Swiss-Prot record:
Family membership: Belongs to the ZFPL1 family.
GO cellular component, one term: membrane
Organism (species): Drosophila erecta (Fruit fly)
Name by which UniProt lists this protein: Zinc finger protein-like 1 homolog
Keyword set includes Phosphoprotein: yes
Disordered: region residues: 199-230
Localization of this protein: Membrane
SUPFAM superfamilies: RING/U-box
Membrane topology: Single-pass membrane protein
Top-rank taxon, per record: Eukaryota
Amino acid sequence: MGLCKCPKRLVTNQFCFEHRVNVCEHCMVQSHPKCIVQSYLQWLRDSDYISNCTLCGTTLEQGDCVRLVCYHVFHWDCLNARQAALPANTAPRGHQCPACTVEIFPNANLVSPVADALKSFLSQVNWGRNGLGLALLSEEQNSLKAIKPKVASQSAVSNMTKVHHIHSGGERERTKPNGHDAVSPHSVLLMDAFNPPSAGDYASSRRPLLPRQSPIGGTDRDDNKYQRRTPAELFSRWTRRFYAPSSRPPWRRTWFLVTAGILAFVLFVYLMAWLGRGGSDAVDEGWNNPNPQPNHYE
């Protein structure tokens, strides 16, 4: 589990293999539409990845891509050609992900930005509309090249209110007494009831009253948190803990300093005693020898 770096600050267990950051579904649609995203545990087991479409073998940077609800990414043209080749009477459960055999069509009650972006792709083709329960397109419309929707469409994940101005009376014109044409527009308010603005969205736009000091190691927490630390960095982090503001009671820090001082003093006394005994070993060895040999003088 990790915290996404977007303003929503959502807790997620999904991890971007390319950028090595935790990502939520909103970021998958907006900022990481073509990245390889799987669980963080999967990245710990095997961090190697191939940023190619498994259907055609080419890189995902070429062409529009679609992300399924299982978070696997494919070229939309490749996936559309593969699923369109199936029989017309194929059940929705027969359309499965080529990588993990999970059903392509999301559940009707699933509230997810990834599912909304996927539905915008599926609604452009007949096999997708059939699985979603929508009316099929005519043969002429189906033969024409469908307009490819944007993967990072704001309408799929936006929480803002959309106001559409339409003309009343079925686009019928009304004429004023002075002869000028006038149209009486009215507004229809469509609100997104699934994703209301959270309190974090309002709090992110507020400026703090006082500057907040970054925690120890906070400058490189997101960039270098997976790199191996050097002994110098570990020692500097340990020494800075004495000066960094802490929420712990002050007596704990005093107790730690006193204990560390006592241990250092005991170690110093033991070291000096050991060095003192080492210098007198040669003298004591002569007095304690049970078989002394007198020196012979010529």
